Amino acid sequence: MGQNLVSLLPPESLYHGNVTMTQQNTPKIAVIGFGEAGSCLCQGWGRSDIRAFDIKQIGDTDIAADKTRQMKDAGVIIGDDAASTVREAYMIFSTVTADQAHAAASAVAAGIGQGAYFFDLNSCAPSTKQKNAAIITKAGGRYVDVAVMATITPK
């Protein structure tokens, strides 16, 4: 408990595949889904190099404008779509709602780098998780089912 995810990865895994690293050799992070959990994770990490995408930022609506404002306020780099958002990420966190979990995994698979980790924080059905794992693995990523046991809150 209390360890950050980077410390849990073996050092050699940080240089695996075609995933680009930052100058500090810190894994690039992408977050798909910028609701309560996604925004709290980004704010808690306090980094300026996190890329994020949320389907609700698309379109010319008040909801899209509000979502884009939330992302700007959090200081993340706003992606145009899921695939381009994750393209250079080594650690991808899917924090979308359960009903969007499969669509998100499919969209991420189009851009995931070889050996990149896909952390699925969704509370969807086991059959959906199995489908998501197959899609991510087939695309070259590493699927990790993450059990979230309590509400994610900002620091």
Regions found by a protein language model. Give the residues of each.
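Charged/polar low-complexity intrinsically disordered segments
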Residues: 3-4, 12
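NAD(P)+-binding Rossmann beta1-loop-alpha1 motif at the extreme N-terminus of oxidoreductases
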Residues: 18-87, 152
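Rossmann-fold dinucleotide-binding core
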Residues: 32, 128-155
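Short, well-ordered alpha-helices that flank and scaffold nucleotide-derived cofactor binding pockets
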Residues: 39, 43-47, 106, 110, ...
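Hydrophobic residues in well-ordered beta-strands that form the structural core
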Residues: 52, 80, 120, 144-145
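Short, ordered loop/turn segments at secondary-structure junctions
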Residues: 55, 123, 148-149
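Rossmann-like NAD(P)-binding element
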Residues: 76-112, 116-117, 121-124
